[in-house]
Every structure is written in C-alpha cells, then in structure tokens.
Amino acid sequence: MSRLNIFLLIIVMGCALSVVNSTNQQRQIFIQLQRAQSQEHQLQQDYAQLQYQQSALSKTSRIEQLATSSLKMQPITTGRTQYLTLSPGAAKAVDVPLPASAAPTGGAR
C-alpha cells in the first residue's frame, strides 16, 4: 500500500469514529430532552394541583369553619359589640420625624 492509501485509510477511520461519537452525543442529548419534557409535564400537573388546593383552602366557608372550630371565634352580634367614643381633643395628630434611611427620595409630591 502506498503512503497515500494509508493516509486516506486513517482519515476515513477518523471520520467514522467522529460519526459514531456525534451519534452517541445526539442520543444522550435526546434522552436529556425527554427527561426535561417529562419533568416539565410533572411540574405543570403539580402546579395545577396546587392551584386547585389553594382555591379550595381559600373559600370563605372553609375559613369561617376553621375560625369557629379551631380558633373558637364567634360571629359578630350587636349585643357583644362595644363602640368607643372619643372626646373631641382625644385624638391628636403628631408629627414623627423619619429616619434618614426611610425618608422619601424624590417620588411623587
């Protein structure tokens, strides 16, 4: 065999190994893609389930039931309501200086 034939054989073998390597990488990336898509689908299902649970837990009837049973709260009645009346000078507005870190920095006036 001539040197040219040996050189070409080495080039062909290198190309064949390169094709095998790229095919293997493509398969691994495709497997990762399928796993990511499966995880995305599972997360979407979990999110929908959590939204349903949130809506069920935030219903007014459930909140009232928990307030009366767990916290021993009772509905407001006029007989138990106490009204406070203030004398005309009892409520007085007082200016309190703000610390420098809480002072407004030029918003709307």
Swiss-Prot record:
Residues 1-3 are cytoplasmic. Belongs to the FtsL family. Part of a complex composed of FtsB, FtsL and FtsQ. The keyword Cell inner membrane applies. PANTHER family: CELL DIVISION PROTEIN FTSL. It comes from the Bacteria. It is a single-pass type II membrane protein. This is Cell division protein FtsL. Keywords: Cell cycle, Cell division, Cell inner membrane, Cell membrane, Membrane, Transmembrane, Transmembrane helix. GO terms for cellular component: cell division site; plasma membrane. Residues 22-109 are periplasmic. One of its GO terms (biological process) is FtsZ-dependent cytokinesis. It is found in: Cell inner membrane. The keyword Cell inner membrane applies. Its main location: membrane. InterPro entries: Cell_div_FtsL (IPR011922). Essential cell division protein. May link together the upstream cell division proteins, which are predominantly cytoplasmic, with the downstream cell division proteins, which are predominantly periplasmic. Signal peptide: none annotated. The chain crosses the membrane at residues 4-21. HAMAP family: FtsL.
